């Protein structure tokens, strides 16, 4: 679909492949990943591109703001 994107969220616990709306906010991707991997609520998590591990995404922006493409690998890590 034109308004959806397939994303691979990679953590120390493995990789989760999921389809999101391009308008999905980063914090909602983090929340879904937290639930999928059963990560603790108190963990302060951030999302970034695999190629740019030091450029964390703003949690209030959407996937489309970062031009995330189908099949892209995003890293979920502790801040």
Predicted feature locations:
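Ubiquitin system architectures
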Residues: 1-79
């Amino acid at each position: 679909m034109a308004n959806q994107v397939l994303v691979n969220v990679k953590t120390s616990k493995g990789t989760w492949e999921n389809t999101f709306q391009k308008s999905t906010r980063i914090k909602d991707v983090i929340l879904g990943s937290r639930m999928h991997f059963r990560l603790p609520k108190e963990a302060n998590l951030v999302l970034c591109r695999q190629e740019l591990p030091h450029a964390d995404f703003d949690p209030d922006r959407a996937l489309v703001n970062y031009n995330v493409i189908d099949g892209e690998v995003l890293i979920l890590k502790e801040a």
